[in-house]
Amino acid sequence: MEGSLFFTNATPSTSILKITDYKYLRLEKNDSTFVAELVLCRPKQYNSMDDDFYNEFISIYDEIQNDSKIRCVILRGEGKGLTAGLNLGKIAPLITGDSEVSQSQNNLDLFKMIRRWQASLDKINKCSKPTIALIHGACIGGGVDMITACDIRLCSSDAKFSIRETKLSIIADLGTLQRISKIVGSGFARELALTGKDIDAKTAERFNLVNHVYPDHDTLLSEGRKLALSIAQNSPLVVQATKLTLNHADDHTIDEGLYRVALQNAAFLKSDDLNESATSFFEKRQPIFKCNL
């Protein structure tokens, strides 16, 4: 029953969201490098987010997960920045609800919508393929929700970050508050979340929100693509299992993590990819990996 989400932490089902005509997102695949670029492609709207955006995001990450020719994902935005966050003009009617139904029904509909949006961005974290966020210009509100779900974050020197929801009298509800303390530390996370202030690229780097800052957008793209390629050239079986192991470590003890990785290596250590790594090393050629989780 849909109402059961009130009483459980279960992620809402998104299996019915299959979209073929994307308007907010573009997936650029390169079968020779095994790197895909997921592009927020509405620059005139500052790549802002609304209900249709989140539905597309669910569908496109299902496509990424199920495509064995994608080993690493780059997430980036077209135009002047990554995203300005929520499109408040389009979201406002969804929040105020339908005057022809009861307030309790409007509240339930809003709850379901928020849970679906949460599941949308959580697709990044749950996808076994690593995602690298390349951030330039504005990364506001929902943009921070999105990048904190990514595995690696890089930015250019013009990047600006804000948990802007606070200034709009909204609690950030799509993942930032659950993830950012683990990235930047509790004290600075609280400073950002309680003030809603902007921070620049250098501050983001100093507090580990991003790994590296590059002088301009072109350098960011070039270096981000090099990093993605270096990941995609490794065994996809090992890369994907490593990501899942790191995710598991976020909320389990060291002993639980060690037991899990022992089981994984007992199952996968003698893989075809291991044999291919050894063979290609002695033959002095690039390995040709075929295994995926």
Curated annotation (Swiss-Prot):
The record's listing under CDD domains reads: crotonase-like
For this UniProt entry, which residues form the secretion signal?
Answer: none
Write the protein's name: Delta(3,5)-Delta(2,4)-dienoyl-CoA isomerase, mitochondrial
GO cellular component entries: mitochondrion; peroxisome
Q: Which Pfam families does UniProt cross-reference here?
A: ECH_1
Where is the protein situated, by its record's location annotation?
Mitochondrion
Substrates-to-products reaction catalysed: (3E,5Z)-octadienoyl-CoA = (2E,4E)-octadienoyl-CoA; (3E,5Z,8Z,11Z,14Z)-eicosapentaenoyl-CoA = (2E,4E,8Z,11Z,14Z)-eicosapentaenoyl-CoA
Q: Which InterPro entries match?
A: ClpP/crotonase-like_dom_sf, Ech1-like, Enoyl-CoA_hyd/isom_CS, Enoyl-CoA_hydra/iso, Enoyl-CoA_hydra_C
Organism of origin is: Dictyostelium discoideum (Social amoeba)
Q: What biological-process terms (Gene Ontology) are attached?
A: fatty acid beta-oxidation
Give the binding site residues for substrate.
A84, G85, L86, N87, L88, G142
Q: Name one GO molecular function term.
A: delta(3,5)-delta(2,4)-dienoyl-CoA isomerase activity
- The protein's site described by Important for catalytic activity is found at E165, D173
Copy the pathway line from the protein's UniProt record.
Lipid metabolism; fatty acid beta-oxidation
> Which family does the entry's similarity section mention?
Belongs to the enoyl-CoA hydratase/isomerase family.
Q: What is its EC number?
A: 5.3.3.-
Q: What does this protein do?
A: Isomerization of 3-trans,5-cis-dienoyl-CoA to 2-trans,4-trans-dienoyl-CoA.
- Keyword annotations: Fatty acid metabolism, Isomerase, Lipid metabolism, Mitochondrion, Transit peptide
